Amino acid sequence: MGAGGFRKNTGRNNTTLPYNVGFLNNVQDTETYNVAVYDELQKVSTATNQMFQAIDEIHEEIDVRIKALNAMNLQFDELENRITTEIETAIADIQTQMGNLSTEDIWDNSVQPPVKLESTVSGFKTSIEGNTTKIQTVEGIVNDQGQEIALVQTELQNINGSLSQYMKLSEYEATWGVNSTVNGRYAGVKLTNNGTNSQFQVTANKFIVGDGSSGNTPFVFEGGRARMEFADIKNVNITTAQIANARIQWAQIDNVSISNAQIQNLSADKITAGSMWGSNWRLTVGGDFVMGGTGGAQLWMNGNRIDFYDGSGALRIRIGSW
């Protein structure tokens, strides 16, 4: 707060937070990578120092305003004491003057009070009204100062409570992160690199990767599930999958277990299978093929012969060797 009552301009008005981290591209060796990481962390350090400097300036501004408010409170107390003294003195003077007046001076056969007493009372009234105006003026200034201080304190609490940006750089590990807590909800990002392993962590209820040109969101992670509109994967290893509708142009599968299959066209060099059944046919593991006919008749075929049985189970025709 300046001398004219204007709000102090601090560095926090020019600070942009949080710091946007760039990606490290085209890094060929460990030395180049470490230099690139160090440069990024220096940028983070600069942004962090700007934020902490802005917070320090807010603390200084609060201290200045509190001192100004204390000084005004002291002036208010001094003014109150002076006004009280003036009122008590004026009352004592009136009492003394009235004690010295005679009956003729007070009434003088007139409805008007005597000039001397009237002048004293009028002066006393003017003094009281002037002091009241001073008190109201001081109270207004004090209230304005209190509102300004409350505003700055709220601003500082929002900065300290909702955003904490930190950076740690040592011989063994470099860490950068931004954490935000609002209404009990926590979100943040964290980047850690110790020269051997690196980690990038995102904590949020919903994580979105969007297309800057089209505005589409091809990747969304929410509620423990990841959703991708389109994926071009060169190699993938899936332990368990649930696919509602899939189209595969070409697949090489070493082992597969299918409960139910609908195949329009099938071409295979070799198929190894156990027994298979249909509504009126059966193919056994031993190589027998049985086909049912009308009235319970059956046709049996294997590598040696062909047998035909009628509805009663009697052999009617046998072709081959036996």
From Swiss-Prot:
Entry keywords, A to Z: Late protein, Viral tail fiber protein, Viral tail protein, Virion
Major location category of this protein: virion
Phosphoprotein is among the record's keywords: no
Keyword Metal-binding part of the UniProt annotation: no
Subcellular location: Virion
A single Gene Ontology CC term: virus tail, fiber
Signal peptide: none
Origin superkingdom: Viruses
Pfam families named in the record: Phage_Tail_Tip (PF09327)
Role summary: Putative tail tip fiber protein.
Name of protein: Putative tail tip fiber protein
Native species: Escherichia phage Phieco32 (Escherichia coli phage phi32)
